Structure formats: C-alpha cells, structure tokens
Amino acid sequence: MSYFPWLTIIVVFPISAGLSIFFLPHRGNKVVRWYTICICLLELLLMTYVFCYHFQLNDPLIQLDEDYEWINIFDFHWRPGIDGLSIGPILLTGFITTLATLAAWPVTRDSRLFHFLMLAMYSGQIGLFSSRDLLLFFLMWELELIPVYLLLSMWGGKKRLYSATKFILYTAGGSVFLLMGVPGMGLYGSNEPTLNFETSANQSYPVSLEILFYFGFLIAYAVKLPIIPLHTWLPDTHGEAHYSTCMLLAGILLKMGAYGLVRINMELLPHAHSIFSPWLVLAGTLQIIYAASTSLGQVNLKKRIAYSSVSHMGFTIIGIGSITDTGLNGAILQLLSHGFLGAALFFLAGTSCDRIRLIYLDEMGGISIPMPKIFTMFSSFSMASLALPGMSGFVAEAVVFFGIITSQKFLFLPKILITFVMAIGMILTPIYLLSMLRQIFYGYKLFNMTNSYFMDSGPRELFVSICIFLPVIGIGIYPDFVLSLSVDKVEAILSNYFYR
C-alpha cells in the first residue's frame, strides 16, 4: 500500500481547486481562464511525475493503492489504485482536458461555472479510471453526468435542451443497471458487502447469475461506448455541444464505457465474458459498417464526425471480444488513438464553424483558400482517422485485425467473414472523410461570396492542433511505447481467467 496519498491528491485536486474559481476577483474572464489552465497543467505534471517515479511498468498488480474507511455501515472504502490498464486513460484524460480548457478560451458567458464544471469532470474521470472499488467506480460514473448535462444545456446550440435531456435519459437509464449490479455483486455470498475489485475477482458465481450481472453492466457501458442501438444520444449531443465539451466527450467520456467493459465485465466476470464475446465481435463488426454508412449520409459536420466516432469504437469492441493478447492490446491502443483523433476533429470542426457561421456541409466549400492552416490540420487528422500508415489509427486497427485473426475462440470461416466486413468498413471510412474534406475545403462556393473574409487559425488553435498531432504521429511510428504500459496487465487478465 502506498504511504503517501498520491492518487487521492490527483483525484481531489482539480475539483477542490475549481471551487476556488468562485472566490476569484471580478476582473474579467482572463483570470479565470489562466487559473483553470494552470490547474490543469499542474495536475498533468503531477500525474507525469508520479507515474514516472512511483510506477513500475513490469508489475501487473495494482500500484499506488490506498485504502481509507469512508462509510462504515456500507463497508464503503476510498480505494484508488492504478495498473497498466488505467495509466493510459488517466494520462489521456490529463492531456485532453488541458487542451480542452485552452480550446474553451472564447467562452465568456458564465465562465466561472463553465471552467469549474470542466475541472469537476476532470476529477470524476480520473477517479473512475483509478478506482478499485465497485461503489467508488459507480459514484465516479455518476459524478460525470452532472457537469456534462450542465455544459450541454447552458453552452450548447439551439437544440441544447433537447440534446441534454436525451443525454441524461440515456446515461441515467443505463446507470440504473449499474446501480443494481454493484450491490448484487458486493452482497453475494456474504452478509457483509465486499466491494473491492480484488475480492470480487476471486469470487465465483453461478453461471446464470454471472450472465445476469454481465448483461446489466453491459447495458450501462453500451450507452457510454456507445454500442448500437444505444448510440442515438451521441450525434445529437455532439451536434449541439460547444467544441471544447465535444473534445471531452469524444476524447474521454466514450472511453469510460470501454474501460468498464474490460475492468469489470472482463476481469471480474470472465465466464460470462467468454459466452458474450462472439456477440460483442458481431456487434462491433455491424457497428463499423452501420455507423460508417450512416456518417456518409449526414449533412451536419459535427454529426458526421460523431458517427465516425461510433464506427471507430467498433474496433475497440471487436478487440475486447476477441479474447486475445493482441486483440485486447489493440482495443486499448484504439481507445487512446481515437481519444486524440476524436478530440482533434471536433476541435477543428468547431473552430471552422465558428469562423464561417455554417454547420451544414452542402452550404460550405472553398474554405481551403482563405484558411490554409485549418485545411492542413483538418486534412492531416482526417488522414490519421482513416488509418493512414505511420499514424496511430493504422497501428490500432491493424493490431485489432491480427487479434481477431489469431483468436482461438472463433472458427476459420467466421474469422474470414469478420475480417472481410471490417475491411469493408475501413473502405467506407475514407469515403465519408474525403467526401467531408471535399465539401468543406474544395470548390469556390464561399470563396466567391461577396464581402467574405475568414480569419485563419491563430496561435492558440495551432498550438492545440500540433499538441494533439505529435502523439498521433508518435504512436504511429513507435506504438510499443504505449503497448508497454498495458501488455503485462493484459497478459495477467487473460492468463488468470481464460487460459487456466
């Protein structure tokens, strides 16, 4: 057990520092912006220091773990702890949230509340990825809903209330199943609740009960991932949210569902996962095709990118369902890769739409001439998203491909069919992305308009874009650095639960 509460400080620091925003002097929004960015940077630097000097990569066990009694009547303990599975999402959270606060620079209305909500999300996300207690996991899962709902309903587009209501209904509805499963697992087999992951991992359940727990948790995660048909909140939410909120949604929120699927369903309910895995692979395969086809028909720029996110998350679902070292490592790599790419595409889409005051693709055209910097960055991230070799998207999807091909869970013919359908999805991806680029940037529609003047990307936008582009290239050239974070933990999960 860790003697110094590093993780508690990392989890609590953003939201506690965020409360001080309301006590800052009334001297304009600039003080609030710089204060929030400094808090996010300090948190990111603290994370990096702790993980570099106090975390052993070759140890698959929980590290930096803490255990403090909180609510004795429920045997509820504050139990943070990290391993190779959680370190990647935590660092991604710190990186994307810091850049999202910088992207939110133009927000001036109620900026104190806006930036506090972003810091509250920051704490909730890190708390979820570092929790090793079922009830703490659930509380952090729910803590995320309130800031997202307020950010949507107060700083969104014209249909923001509809989108925010749809978001809260879907996610809260999914959380009901999580709420039923957590005490069920904790109370089974003993009079006193056992909510920590280590005890639950050693607990055996009747197959029917394990399937019931698994299915309930799966519904909750399927909303956040999202898995079709529980995905319809996502395009509406992305279509109305401010682009800094979209960065957090696409970059981090979707990853919470996949993380829960691995951390709880795969690690704690292995027999049920083995039964459900073919259906997960089937759902992921259909999701790639369906979302890519639907994206091609979207005329709203943000909704097109939102459906591309749904399509790319299909690769993560396939990797998790493959039950192989390669497939699960590929799923984790795809999580991190899409975290960068999704955040970047929504940021660039938002800045572009702010400049031209248009959101529909059929009204755009010719923007590349007055805005060459945005055109260059948008094209580069689109190439990475369509899995261009040398970028993170290509490596992640290729590793998932190899994972499903080498899986012992499936016969030869089903594997051929799955890889064939995945290949079709990878062909559809460049079709809708290149079509989107053509509609926005090529032609002369807007360029020939009278009195048209569009300002190109400024230093702030360029800085955010380049900061995201560097890890995209880095992962594409040397993915082993990211894979080394999780490879030992992945082997431990699979060897302990499937190959014994």
Curated annotation (Swiss-Prot):
It comes from the Eukaryota. The keyword Cell division does not apply. Pfam families: Proton_antipo_M. Keywords: Chloroplast, Membrane, NAD, NADP, Plastid, Plastoquinone, Quinone, Thylakoid, Translocase, Transmembrane, Transmembrane helix. It catalyses: a plastoquinone + NADH + (n+1) H(+)(in) = a plastoquinol + NAD(+) + n H(+)(out); a plastoquinone + NADPH + (n+1) H(+)(in) = a plastoquinol + NADP(+) + n H(+)(out). One of its GO terms (biological process) is ATP synthesis coupled electron transport. It is a multi-pass membrane protein. The gene is ndhD. This is NAD(P)H-quinone oxidoreductase chain 4, chloroplastic. The chain crosses the membrane at residues 4-24, 37-57, 87-107, 113-130, 134-154, 167-187, 211-231, 242-262, 272-292, 305-325, 330-350, 386-406, 416-436, 462-482. It is found in: Plastid, Chloroplast thylakoid membrane. Its main location: plastid. Its EC number is 7.1.1.-. It comes from Acorus calamus (Sweet flag). The keyword NAD applies. Belongs to the complex I subunit 4 family. InterPro entries: NADH_Q_OxRdtase_chain4, NADH_Q_OxRdtase_chainM/4, NADH_UbQ_OxRdtase, ND/Mrp_TM. GO terms for molecular function: NADH dehydrogenase (ubiquinone) activity; ubiquinone binding. One of its GO terms (cellular component) is chloroplast thylakoid membrane.
